[in-house]
């Protein structure tokens, strides 16, 4: 127990003492190894550096944009701290970009340009040529400008257009001549000068209001459609009705039918003329003839293996005597049409009438030749 109590508190203390003894015996080996290997820099002290040994953070986050991130470190030549790199490591290096005299760090810390005006010269304004013309005209008290005055306004307010004037000036002229929103106004007699004035069409002023100059010009079809009178029934009539006219009987019937079709939904549409009365009279005659055909059925006579259709022809002749309405008066639509067969019994009757003949009419009975 006493031997355990005499051990040092650190369990690795004995190992460190043993390693120190072995290192003393091999001191010659260490001297030879130090002669062969290059001299390593001394390790920095364990206590750390003082606050005065650290440099201020670089003003630019990128090393290649004129920042002092390379030459201002205390670890390079001339630093107050411990020389981590050998002397002369960064002495022959140079900055990637030369320092700029007018660099605005507060405005653009990531871009090396003289000032903000140079940036505006490189960026094209997000406006079309017609929008630029409208802006120039609206910013004048007289609301009219000559071509040269429009050029001057664009060049003064947008530095991008100060270069290569030939290109955008041609576009300005084309927009003035092809766009319907711009109107040419002649000069007055008391106004000397060269060139006509250009003004903005009053119908197109809403396209450039509230500083929104990016909207496209309105199509001609929309402007024409806006002037159409929706309450005019004369314009809504088809060409066929206009050509027939209301004087001719065909035109009167078609107009009557078109007025029936044009009735508003939700209201009952009355049938045209006496079509309902004719259909009811036709159905009455049809039902009476069919009842007579079914109840007073006569025995069939067969000759030469074929049926005798004389009676059937008689009843069919009576059915065809029903008056048919005029084809000029078309029947009403499905929603308001009077049903020709209102009951189920009449539907069955119609089915039997539509097929009055069976196979027995066409073929002889069994055993009869």
From Swiss-Prot:
Expression tissues = Localized to the animal hemisphere of early cleavage stage embryos. Zygotic expression is restricted to the dorsal part of the epibranchial placodes of the head within a region located near the tip of the first, second and third visceral pouch.
Q: Which residues bind DNA?
A: 124-218
Q: Does the keyword DNA-binding apply?
A: yes
Q: Which Pfam families match?
A: Forkhead
**Keywords, in A-Z order:** Activator, DNA-binding, Nucleus, Transcription, Transcription regulation
Concerning InterPro entries, the annotation shows: Fork_head_dom, FOX_domain-containing, TF_fork_head_CS_1, TF_fork_head_CS_2, WH-like_DNA-bd_sf, WH_DNA-bd_sf
Give compartment(s).
Nucleus
Q: Which SUPFAM superfamilies match?
A: Winged helix' DNA-binding domain
Reply yes or no: does the keyword Transcription apply.
Answer: yes
Q: Name one GO biological process term.
A: cell differentiation
What Gene3D superfamilies does the entry give?
Winged helix-like DNA-binding domain superfamily/Winged helix DNA-binding domain
The principal localisation class reads nucleus
Where is it found, in Gene Ontology cellular component terms? nucleus
Q: A Gene Ontology MF term for this entry?
A: DNA-binding transcription factor activity, RNA polymerase II-specific
Q: Which PROSITE patterns match?
A: FORK_HEAD_1, FORK_HEAD_2, FORK_HEAD_3
- Give the residues annotated as coiled coil: none
Specify the domain of life of the species encoding this protein.
Answer: Eukaryota
- Region annotated Disordered sits at 215-252
Its job: Possible transcriptional activator.
Q: What is this protein called?
A: Forkhead box protein I2-A
The organism is Xenopus laevis
